[in-house]
UniProtKB/Swiss-Prot annotation:
This is Conotoxin Fi11.11. The keyword Secreted applies. One of its GO terms (cellular component) is extracellular region. Disulfide bonds join C1-C15, C8-C20, C14-C24, C19-C28. It comes from Conus figulinus (Fig cone). Expressed by the venom duct.
Amino acid sequence: CHHEGLPCTSGDGCCGMECCGGVCSSHCGNGRRRQVPLKSFGQR
């Protein structure tokens, strides 16, 4: 299985974690705020 912080796809299985935004995260619900900066890149 994949460890936390490693890239993953919707089909890959993480070690007791979920695949959030293409990365294994043990706190998927709290990680929503980290996905917000993706929009800031477009503003540059």
